[in-house]
């Protein structure tokens, strides 16, 4: 839990430096993927989401502003970008990953349930 608080503090500091990184005209992951994403915290600086993807689960297309992923429970994921690009990643429990704004959908192609904390940066 201490790691999460440190991560949130660092992200708040990044928000001060980098300002607004919101994706305009984007599909909100909390709305389009409400069955797999839950809101944990929202304020003027960040929005923290928890995403859970069971094996074989697929999200709908959505967008994120700049954000950080903290991997609670790892697994293998395939990301499909709005531009048609397809990438695969093997998330390991405890990984912390920074991502620039993007529009994508993801699917769990592994055999374990993936759990992620997503910290989206606001202005």
Predicted regions and their residues:
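Bacterial N-terminal signal peptides
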Residues: 6-15
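Conserved short histidine dyad/triad with adjacent acidic residue
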Residues: 47-63
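Ligand-binding loop in jelly-roll beta-barrel domains
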Residues: 101-122
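Short acidic-glycine-tyrosine-enriched beta hairpin
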Residues: 83-101
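Short N-terminal segments immediately surrounding and downstream of signal-peptide cleavage
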Residues: 21-44
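Histidine-centered metal-chelating micro-motifs
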Residues: 56-59, 97-107
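Glycine- and acidic-residue-biased ligand/ion/polar-headgroup-sensing regions
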Residues: 64-83
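Positively charged n-region of N-terminal signal peptides that target proteins for export
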Residues: 1-4
């Amino acid at each position: 839990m201490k790691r999460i608080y440190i991560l949130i503090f660092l992200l708040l500091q990044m928000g001060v430096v980098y300002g607004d990184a919101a994706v305009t005209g984007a599909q909100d992951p909390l709305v389009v993927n409400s069955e797999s994403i839950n809101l944990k915290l929202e304020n003027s600086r960040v929005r923290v989401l928890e995403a859970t993807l069971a094996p074989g689960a697929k999200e709908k297309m959505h967008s994120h502003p700049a954000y950080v992923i903290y991997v609670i429970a790892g697994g293998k994921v395939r990301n499909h970008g709005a531009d048609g690009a397809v990438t695969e990643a093997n998330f390991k429990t405890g990984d912390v990953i920074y991502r620039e704004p993007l529009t994508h959908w993801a699917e769990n192609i592994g055999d374990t349930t993936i759990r992620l904390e997503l910290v989206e940066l606001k202005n």
